[in-house]
Amino acid sequence: MTLLQAIILGIVQGLTEFLPVSSSGHLVLASYYLGWWEKLPLYVDIATNTGTFFAVLVVLRKDVWQALSGFFAGLTSSTARQQEGWRMALLVVLGSIPTAMIGLGLKPIFEELNQPLYVSFALIVTGLVLWFTPKSGLKRNAMSLSWLDATIGGIAQGCAVIPGISRSGSTISTMLWRGATSDLAPRFSFLMYLVVSFGVAILGIDEVREEGLQLAPLLGMIIASFVTGYIALLWLFSVLKKGQFKWFAPYLWVVAAITLIKVAMG
């Protein structure tokens, strides 16, 4: 892999991880249209996710600190267990359990779908989910979300193991349907992403080593995905506040249609 390829893939990941358009699907399509690989190597997903992981840490640093400090304080203090930090931490952990079960159990199967044809159909589904998502929830905050809400959110995130199904789109849409505010839905979604992304990185270390990826391309992917991810994350919060989430759907349908035509034409 060249440094230029690495940077391009990092930019694609950064822009599409947080926007509800499926980063995994776009990485597959970027590779397809540029003629690099028939099947995207798993280490690309791992490396680019490292950059977006740190982008979330920076943007949501207050939420991360509140959840971590609230969790540890709640272990010894009943008063702390009545605070939002403790509640959010437990919800994130609970939501991550079904995600991990789905991911570990089905990822080997769905990795075979890392192809433009399957990605296109998944993008169409993601577009439908976004189109019918309510502009805002029922103003429920973290303290009013239930264990069932978190579990359903985690299942939605697990579905994103399918290339072309947007992780952020699935989880944010689900939480809005469950009544979360347009501010809480993405915060919960991206806190869950931190847990899952960290787990994926740990599990994928050996694969990155086996590939013998050079340091320059590796850093290129990480830095590019971090910078563009930071920008995309800030923009997404603005989009949600304006209730414009559904307008990503037409873009997905156009991309899917163009890709299906190209695949059909060979």
UniProtKB/Swiss-Prot annotation:
Keywords: Antibiotic resistance, Cell inner membrane, Cell membrane, Cell shape, Cell wall biogenesis/degradation, Hydrolase, Membrane, Peptidoglycan synthesis, Transmembrane, Transmembrane helix. It is found in: Cell inner membrane. InterPro entries: UppP. Its EC number is 3.6.1.27. Pfam families: BacA. One of its GO terms (cellular component) is plasma membrane. Bacitracin is thought to be involved in the inhibition of peptidoglycan synthesis by sequestering undecaprenyl diphosphate, thereby reducing the pool of lipid carrier available. This is Undecaprenyl-diphosphatase. The lineage of its organism: Bacteria, Bacillati, Cyanobacteriota, Cyanophyceae, Acaryochloridales. The gene is uppP.
